[in-house]
Amino acid sequence: IRTTRGDVVVRLYPEWAPSTVANFIALAQSGYFDGNRWFRIVPNFVAQTGDPTGDPDSEAGYTIPAEENPVEQRSGIIAMGLDYKDNKPLRDSAGTQFYITLSPQPYLGRDFSVFGEVESGFDVIANLIESDRMTLVRRIADD
């Protein structure tokens, strides 16, 4: 993930969330994320992006099923954003928006499909502001 602040390398885990990883790779390879703004930055919580309009309430026009896994949401975890109703996350409402945790978030639980983590460049994510953008998102290796 190339951002206006620097580069971030993430490791995706298809063994945790195969459909979510496939969705993310397809979006990245198509250029869908290129130019997207980091529209939600909450210090010590999350940095969120993945919508070309920069609107956290925007919908992708499709959803993917939630993929529950036992991974704790520690710092640098990548998971899918969800819609909410009555202050509760709606499972199976993920599409294109994702977030990266800026600190451990164990209370987020298993409703959110965790599909990867930051391998290098966490300092870039930790210093993002809401006007920053992803300039290029591509898959660089198969391993």
Locate predicted features.
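Cyclophilin-like peptidyl-prolyl cis-trans isomerases
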Residues: 1-143
